[in-house]
């Protein structure tokens, strides 16, 4: 797997790769990676999951390119190379979950739609990205021709506590002014404690390949939420299950 990624996938991606930073209205910028080919017949926007980055989906990007897509991937704010509020890159924070959705709206309007023109645009969103994508579809049901949400974060876990307990703890801590502090369920990035066996991965080779990138790149080391992120993430459930939306 590693050899194929290094000798086939990565070189082909590099030939089409374009990076850009889209300024955000509240400061900082959103990092995006674009892959465009003249023979494309459609386009796809990739939204990664919690503590991930667009970098994790490079293999998936290659498959999409092979299938005739142009690919547009972002790092959500507080992830990857996008704007952060802290120097500690293991912390994952957002003031309002809707910030993710507004970032995506801006990315679509300013970058994707002008570039894709008449191409049908699809959405591929994973985990937390699935929650962002779901809220985007509520706001703009006509924007995407197709949408695939893999393991969407509709009811995030606050283990070891029941969700209502996790929500209560996070709300109290936020009320006490600790919204940007490390939450009780998280810990700093530690490669020694991140093993294939404790992960949700089903491929040891893929886990090792991305984990090595994380070890050597601080911007890929998100591993823990703040109380503010926990509070906002748990609040997503009510929004996504609202039948009126």
Where are these regions (language model features)?
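Conserved alpha/beta-hydrolase
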Residues: 54, 63-87
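Alpha/beta-hydrolase-fold enzymes
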Residues: 133-221
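An N-terminal hydrophobic leader/cap segment in hydrolases
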Residues: 1-23, 28-36
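Active-site glycine-rich loops that stabilize anionic/oxyanionic intermediates
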Residues: 41, 49-52
């Amino acid at each position: 797997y590693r050899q194929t990624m290094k000798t086939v996938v990565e070189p082909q991606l590099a030939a089409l790769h374009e990076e850009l930073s889209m300024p955000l209205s509240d400061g900082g910028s959103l990092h995006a990676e674009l892959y465009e080919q003249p023979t494309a017949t459609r386009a796809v926007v990739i939204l990664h999951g919690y503590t991930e980055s667009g970098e994790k989906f490079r293999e998936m990007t290659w498959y999409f390119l092979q299938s005739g897509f142009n690919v547009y991937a972002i790092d959500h704010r507080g992830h990857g190379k996008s704007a952060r509020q802290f120097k500690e890159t293991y912390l994952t924070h957002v003031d309002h979950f809707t910030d993710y959705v507004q970032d995506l709206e801006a990315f679509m309007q300013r970058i994707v739609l002008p570039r894709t023109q008449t191409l049908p645009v699809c959405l591929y969103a994973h985990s937390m990205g699935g929650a962002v994508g779901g809220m985007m579809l509520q706001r703009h049901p006509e924007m995407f021709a197709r949408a695939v949400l893999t393991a969407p974060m509709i009811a995030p876990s606050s283990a070891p506590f029941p969700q209502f307990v996790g929500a209560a703890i996070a709300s109290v801590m936020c009320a006490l002014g600790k919204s940007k502090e490390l939450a009780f369920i998280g810990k700093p990035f530690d490669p020694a404690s991140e093993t294939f066996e404790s992960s949700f991965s089903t491929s040891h080779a893929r886990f090792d390949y991305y984990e090595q990138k994380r070890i050597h790149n601080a911007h890929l080391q998100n591993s823990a939420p703040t109380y503010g992120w926990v509070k906002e993430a748990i609040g997503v459930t009510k929004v996504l299950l609202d039948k009126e939306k």
